[in-house]
């Protein structure tokens, strides 16, 4: 992506490549950032707090979500307080359950009630959304992240689930809570997310790189595809006749 586009929805960058995060921030291409342990591992991050410190020094004024890494709620709470202290623009990512399937609702209620900005992650079902909506403070900024892309990979249409989530947030009401479309798989998800009522869509760098293709004529894409396949055939030296 070479310039920021007004797509009617906030665009967040999802990843943990510090140089890429700095680049898209400096070029004004996104509205915020999300990270997770997978991206940290992929980027070879060995010191989480040092990484976060470097990110926040470079990006002081856009929302950034950092995830807790423990699995028991006592440790999650301790980590959440530490992560929250890293900066005013930090949202603490807390999974909707731990790895045993135990609900994080009580902890979410406690921390949100204290004014801690949270990003509730790994949400897949309307029941999970309903639980989270019921415990978030209406006074505290928060994000509800529905993993629409991964829902789609199970053969389930994510759009009705995301629409229900948007309705629940509106009717609670939670004026400072934003709905985020997570695990983005393709550029078209932007328009699906907007249609469903999402405030934010987060996407990895490979999807961000494709945003300049929005609006390209399909005839042009068709011709480019033919040229690409022809070039592949020529370079491979294939012969039929």
Predicted regions mapped to residue ranges:
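C-terminal extensions of enzymes
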Residues: 240-241
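Flexible domain-boundary/linker segments
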Residues: 41, 50, 128, 210-211
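Active-site beta->alpha loop and helix N-cap motifs at the rims of alpha/beta catalytic domains
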Residues: 2-110, 114, 148-151
């Amino acid at each position: 992506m070479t310039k920021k586009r007004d797509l009617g929805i906030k665009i967040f960058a999802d990843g943990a490549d510090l140089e890429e995060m700095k680049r898209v921030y400096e070029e004004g291409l996104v509205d915020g950032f999300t990270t997770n342990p997978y991206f940290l591992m992929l980027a070879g991050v060995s010191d989480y707090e040092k990484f976060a410190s470097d990110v926040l020094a470079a990006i002081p004024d856009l929302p950034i979500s950092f995830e807790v890494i423990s699995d028991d709620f006592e440790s999650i709470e301790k980590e959440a307080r530490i992560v929250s202290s890293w900066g005013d623009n930090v949202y603490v990512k807390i999974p909707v359950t731990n790895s045993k399937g135990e609900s994080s609702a009580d902890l979410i209620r406690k921390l949100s009630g204290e004014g801690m900005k949270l990003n509730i992650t790994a949400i897949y079902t309307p029941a999970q959304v309903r639980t989270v909506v019921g415990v978030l403070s209406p006074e505290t900024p928060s994000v509800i992240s529905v993993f629409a892309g991964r829902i789609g990979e199970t053969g389930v249409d994510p759009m009705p689930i995301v629409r229900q989530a948007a309705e629940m947030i509106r009717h609670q009401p939670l004026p400072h809570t934003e709905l985020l479309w997570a695990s983005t798989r393709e550029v078209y998800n932007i328009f699906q997310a907007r249609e469903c009522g999402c405030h934010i869509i987060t996407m990895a760098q490979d999807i961000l790189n494709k945003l300049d293709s929005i609006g390209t004529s399909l005839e042009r894409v068709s011709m480019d595809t033919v040229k690409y396949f022809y070039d592949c055939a020529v370079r491979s030296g294939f012969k039929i006749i």
